[in-house]
Protein backbone atom coordinates (compact mmCIF):
# COMPACT_ATOMS: atom_id res chain seq x y z
CA UNK A 1 0.00 0.00 0.00
CA UNK A 2 2.78 2.41 1.02
CA UNK A 3 4.68 1.63 -2.19
CA UNK A 4 1.58 2.28 -4.30
CA UNK A 5 0.91 5.59 -2.52
CA UNK A 6 4.53 6.53 -2.84
CA UNK A 7 4.25 5.86 -6.63
CA UNK A 8 0.95 7.80 -7.05
CA UNK A 9 2.24 10.85 -5.20
CA UNK A 10 5.54 10.80 -7.19
CA UNK A 11 3.67 10.59 -10.52
CA UNK A 12 1.54 13.58 -9.52
CA UNK A 13 4.67 15.67 -8.97
CA UNK A 14 6.16 15.03 -12.40
CA UNK A 15 7.24 18.34 -13.91
CA UNK A 16 8.72 17.26 -17.24
CA UNK A 17 9.97 14.25 -19.14
CA UNK A 18 12.49 14.20 -21.96
CA UNK A 19 13.77 11.05 -23.62
CA UNK A 20 12.83 8.72 -20.78
CA UNK A 21 14.11 11.01 -18.00
CA UNK A 22 11.48 12.20 -15.53
CA UNK A 23 11.92 15.22 -13.27
CA UNK A 24 10.27 14.68 -9.88
CA UNK A 25 10.20 17.11 -6.98
CA UNK A 26 11.91 16.03 -3.78
CA UNK A 27 10.11 15.29 -0.54
CA UNK A 28 10.59 18.12 1.95
CA UNK A 29 10.04 16.50 5.34
CA UNK A 30 12.70 14.35 7.00
CA UNK A 31 12.31 12.38 10.24
CA UNK A 32 14.89 12.91 12.97
CA UNK A 33 17.41 10.07 13.18
CA UNK A 34 16.33 8.50 9.88
CA UNK A 35 17.90 8.44 6.40
CA UNK A 36 16.47 10.94 3.94
CA UNK A 37 16.87 11.17 0.17
CA UNK A 38 17.00 14.63 -1.39
CA UNK A 39 16.02 14.35 -5.04
CA UNK A 40 17.74 16.39 -7.72
CA UNK A 41 16.92 15.32 -11.27
CA UNK A 42 17.83 17.42 -14.29
CA UNK A 43 16.91 16.01 -17.69
CA UNK A 44 18.43 16.88 -21.05
CA UNK A 45 16.09 18.25 -23.68
CA UNK A 46 17.53 15.83 -26.23
CA UNK A 47 18.60 12.43 -25.00
CA UNK A 48 20.70 11.77 -28.12
CA UNK A 49 23.00 14.73 -27.40
CA UNK A 50 26.27 13.78 -25.71
CA UNK A 51 27.03 15.65 -22.53
CA UNK A 52 29.19 15.83 -19.42
CA UNK A 53 27.67 16.99 -16.15
CA UNK A 54 28.85 17.78 -12.66
CA UNK A 55 27.04 19.12 -9.61
CA UNK A 56 27.68 21.16 -6.51
CA UNK A 57 25.34 21.13 -3.52
CA UNK A 58 25.02 24.13 -1.19
CA UNK A 59 23.13 24.47 2.10
CA UNK A 60 21.74 27.30 4.20
CA UNK A 61 20.82 26.15 7.68
CA UNK A 62 17.53 27.32 9.10
CA UNK A 63 18.04 30.62 10.90
CA UNK A 64 21.17 31.61 8.94
CA UNK A 65 21.67 33.78 5.86
CA UNK A 66 24.56 32.35 3.83
CA UNK A 67 24.79 29.25 1.66
CA UNK A 68 27.84 27.03 2.11
CA UNK A 69 29.06 24.33 -0.27
CA UNK A 70 28.73 20.81 1.12
CA UNK A 71 29.81 18.65 -1.83
CA UNK A 72 30.89 18.39 -5.45
CA UNK A 73 30.39 15.34 -7.68
CA UNK A 74 32.35 15.13 -10.93
CA UNK A 75 33.80 12.26 -12.98
CA UNK A 76 32.31 9.75 -10.52
CA UNK A 77 34.21 11.30 -7.62
CA UNK A 78 32.39 12.65 -4.57
CA UNK A 79 34.24 15.52 -2.90
CA UNK A 80 32.81 16.43 0.51
CA UNK A 81 33.52 19.72 2.22
CA UNK A 82 34.68 19.75 5.82
CA UNK A 83 31.44 20.39 7.70
CA UNK A 84 30.74 18.55 10.93
CA UNK A 85 27.00 18.75 10.29
CA UNK A 86 27.41 16.45 7.28
CA UNK A 87 30.54 14.52 8.21
CA UNK A 88 29.96 10.81 7.51
CA UNK A 89 26.32 11.46 6.68
CA UNK A 90 26.23 12.28 2.95
CA UNK A 91 25.98 9.44 0.40
CA UNK A 92 25.78 9.85 -3.38
CA UNK A 93 22.58 8.34 -4.79
CA UNK A 94 22.57 9.74 -8.31
CA UNK A 95 23.69 8.45 -11.71
CA UNK A 96 26.67 6.10 -11.78
CA UNK A 97 28.95 4.78 -14.49
CA UNK A 98 28.48 7.83 -16.71
CA UNK A 99 29.65 11.43 -17.03
CA UNK A 100 26.24 12.38 -18.39
CA UNK A 101 24.53 12.82 -15.03
CA UNK A 102 20.78 13.36 -14.93
CA UNK A 103 20.02 12.05 -11.45
CA UNK A 104 22.08 14.03 -8.94
CA UNK A 105 20.33 12.95 -5.74
CA UNK A 106 21.95 12.41 -2.34
CA UNK A 107 21.18 10.60 0.91
CA UNK A 108 21.59 12.19 4.33
CA UNK A 109 21.89 9.51 7.00
CA UNK A 110 20.97 9.94 10.66
CA UNK A 111 19.23 13.25 10.05
CA UNK A 112 19.44 15.91 12.80
CA UNK A 113 17.71 19.25 13.31
CA UNK A 114 20.87 20.92 12.00
CA UNK A 115 19.90 19.64 8.55
CA UNK A 116 16.74 21.78 8.43
CA UNK A 117 17.04 24.57 5.90
CA UNK A 118 17.44 25.28 2.19
CA UNK A 119 19.42 23.11 -0.22
CA UNK A 120 20.51 24.05 -3.72
CA UNK A 121 21.55 21.49 -6.30
CA UNK A 122 23.64 23.29 -8.94
CA UNK A 123 23.77 21.36 -12.21
CA UNK A 124 26.46 22.26 -14.73
CA UNK A 125 26.17 20.55 -18.11
CA UNK A 126 28.43 20.71 -21.17
CA UNK A 127 26.61 19.70 -24.36
CA UNK A 128 28.59 18.42 -27.35
CA UNK A 129 27.29 19.22 -30.82
CA UNK A 130 28.89 18.57 -34.21
CA UNK A 131 30.56 21.96 -34.57
CA UNK A 132 30.44 23.49 -31.11
CA UNK A 133 29.93 22.98 -27.39
CA UNK A 134 27.35 24.61 -25.17
CA UNK A 135 27.32 25.15 -21.41
CA UNK A 136 24.12 25.16 -19.38
CA UNK A 137 23.41 25.50 -15.69
CA UNK A 138 20.34 24.79 -13.58
CA UNK A 139 19.66 25.25 -9.88
CA UNK A 140 17.19 22.98 -8.10
CA UNK A 141 15.99 24.34 -4.75
CA UNK A 142 14.72 22.17 -1.90
CA UNK A 143 13.47 23.38 1.48
CA UNK A 144 13.81 20.70 4.15
CA UNK A 145 12.11 20.47 7.53
CA UNK A 146 13.17 17.90 10.14
CA UNK A 147 10.37 16.57 12.39
CA UNK A 148 10.15 14.16 15.32
CA UNK A 149 7.91 11.72 13.47
CA UNK A 150 6.44 11.42 10.01
CA UNK A 151 3.28 13.40 9.34
CA UNK A 152 0.79 11.74 7.07
CA UNK A 153 0.12 13.82 4.00
CA UNK A 154 -3.36 14.52 2.65
CA UNK A 155 -2.90 12.16 -0.31
CA UNK A 156 -2.21 9.27 2.07
CA UNK A 157 -5.25 10.08 4.22
CA UNK A 158 -7.59 10.42 1.23
CA UNK A 159 -6.23 7.21 -0.29
CA UNK A 160 -6.85 5.27 2.91
CA UNK A 161 -10.39 6.65 3.23
CA UNK A 162 -11.12 5.71 -0.37
CA UNK A 163 -9.75 2.22 0.27
CA UNK A 164 -12.13 1.68 3.20
CA UNK A 165 -15.07 3.12 1.23
CA UNK A 166 -14.27 0.74 -1.62
CA UNK A 167 -14.11 -2.22 0.78
CA UNK A 168 -17.52 -1.30 2.25
CA UNK A 169 -19.08 -0.85 -1.20
CA UNK A 170 -17.68 -4.17 -2.43
CA UNK A 171 -18.90 -5.94 0.72
CA UNK A 172 -22.42 -4.54 0.29
CA UNK A 173 -22.39 -5.50 -3.38
CA UNK A 174 -21.22 -9.02 -2.55
CA UNK A 175 -23.94 -9.48 0.10
CA UNK A 176 -26.58 -8.16 -2.32
CA UNK A 177 -25.38 -10.59 -5.01
CA UNK A 178 -25.50 -13.50 -2.56
CA UNK A 179 -29.05 -12.58 -1.45
CA UNK A 180 -30.14 -12.21 -5.07
CA UNK A 181 -28.63 -15.55 -6.05
CA UNK A 182 -30.17 -17.24 -2.99
CA UNK A 183 -33.63 -15.89 -3.82
CA UNK A 184 -33.24 -16.89 -7.46
CA UNK A 185 -32.18 -20.42 -6.53
CA UNK A 186 -34.97 -20.69 -3.95
CA UNK A 187 -37.55 -19.52 -6.50
CA UNK A 188 -36.26 -21.98 -9.09
CA UNK A 189 -36.33 -24.80 -6.53
CA UNK A 190 -39.88 -23.91 -5.49
CA UNK A 191 -41.02 -23.74 -9.11
CA UNK A 192 -39.44 -27.13 -9.81
CA UNK A 193 -41.12 -28.59 -6.72
CA UNK A 194 -44.51 -27.24 -7.79
CA UNK A 195 -43.99 -28.61 -11.29
CA UNK A 196 -43.07 -32.03 -9.91
CA UNK A 197 -46.11 -31.95 -7.63
CA UNK A 198 -48.36 -31.07 -10.57
CA UNK A 199 -46.90 -33.90 -12.63
CA UNK A 200 -47.37 -36.29 -9.71
CA UNK A 201 -51.02 -35.28 -9.32
CA UNK A 202 -51.58 -35.61 -13.04
CA UNK A 203 -50.05 -39.09 -13.06
CA UNK A 204 -52.09 -40.11 -10.01
CA UNK A 205 -55.30 -38.83 -11.58
CA UNK A 206 -54.55 -40.64 -14.82
CA UNK A 207 -53.83 -43.85 -12.92
CA UNK A 208 -57.16 -43.60 -11.10
CA UNK A 209 -58.99 -43.08 -14.39
CA UNK A 210 -57.27 -46.12 -15.87
CA UNK A 211 -58.19 -48.19 -12.84
CA UNK A 212 -61.84 -47.05 -13.08
CA UNK A 213 -61.93 -47.94 -16.75
CA UNK A 214 -60.64 -51.43 -16.01
CA UNK A 215 -63.29 -52.00 -13.34
CA UNK A 216 -66.12 -50.89 -15.67
CA UNK A 217 -64.85 -53.17 -18.38
CA UNK A 218 -65.03 -56.12 -16.02
From Swiss-Prot:
Residues annotated as glycosylated: 93, 110, 114, 135
Family classification: Belongs to the sodium channel auxiliary subunit SCN1B (TC 8.A.17) family.
Keyword Transport carried by entry: yes
Cellular localisation: Cell membrane; Perikaryon; Cell projection; Cell projection, Axon
Bilayer topology term: Single-pass type I membrane protein
Molecular function terms from GO: sodium channel inhibitor activity; sodium channel regulator activity; transmembrane transporter binding
Matches recorded under InterPro entries: Ig-like_dom_sf (IPR036179), Ig-like_fold (IPR013783), Ig_V-set (IPR013106), Na_channel_b1/b3 (IPR027098)
Segment forming the signal sequence: 1-18
Segments on the Extracellular face: 19-157
Function (record text): Regulatory subunit of multiple voltage-gated sodium (Nav) channels directly mediating the depolarization of excitable membranes. Navs, also called VGSCs (voltage-gated sodium channels) or VDSCs (voltage-dependent sodium channels), operate by switching between closed and open conformations depending on the voltage difference across the membrane. In the open conformation they allow Na(+) ions to selectively pass through the pore, along their electrochemical gradient.
Key words, A-Z: Cell membrane, Cell projection, Disulfide bond, Glycoprotein, Immunoglobulin domain, Ion transport, Membrane, Signal, Sodium, Sodium transport, Transmembrane, Transmembrane helix, Transport
PANTHER family noted in UniProt: SODIUM CHANNEL SUBUNIT BETA-1 (PTHR10546:SF2), SODIUM CHANNEL SUBUNIT BETA-1 AND 3 (PTHR10546)
SUBUNIT field: A voltage-gated sodium (Nav) channel consists of an ion-conducting pore-forming alpha subunit functional on its own that is regulated by one or more beta subunits. Interacts with SCN1A; regulatory subunit of SCN1A/Nav1.1. Interacts with SCN3A; regulatory subunit of SCN3A/Nav1.3. Interacts with SCN4A; regulatory subunit of SCN4A/Nav1.4. Interacts with SCN5A; regulatory subunit of SCN5A/Nav1.5. Interacts with SCN8A; regulatory subunit of SCN8A/Nav1.6. Interacts with SCN9A; regulatory subunit of SCN9A/Nav1.7. Interacts with SCN10A; regulatory subunit of SCN10A/Nav1.8. Interacts with NFASC.
The protein, known as: Sodium channel regulatory subunit beta-1
Residues in compartment: Cytoplasmic: 180-218
Native organism taxonomy: Eukaryota, Metazoa, Chordata, Craniata, Vertebrata
Glycoprotein listed as a keyword: yes
All copies of domain Ig-like C2-type, residue ranges: 22-150
GO cellular component: axon; perikaryon; plasma membrane; voltage-gated sodium channel complex
Disulfide bonds: 21-43, 40-121
Ranges that cross the membrane: 158-179
Species name: Bos taurus (Bovine)
Domain of life: Eukaryota
Amino acid sequence: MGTLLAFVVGAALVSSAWGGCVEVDSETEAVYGMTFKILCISCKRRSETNAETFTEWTFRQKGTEEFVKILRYENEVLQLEEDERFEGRVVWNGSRGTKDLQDLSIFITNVTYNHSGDYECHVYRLLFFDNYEHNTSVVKKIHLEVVDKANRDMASIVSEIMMYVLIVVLTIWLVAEMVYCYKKIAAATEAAAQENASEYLAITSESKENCTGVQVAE
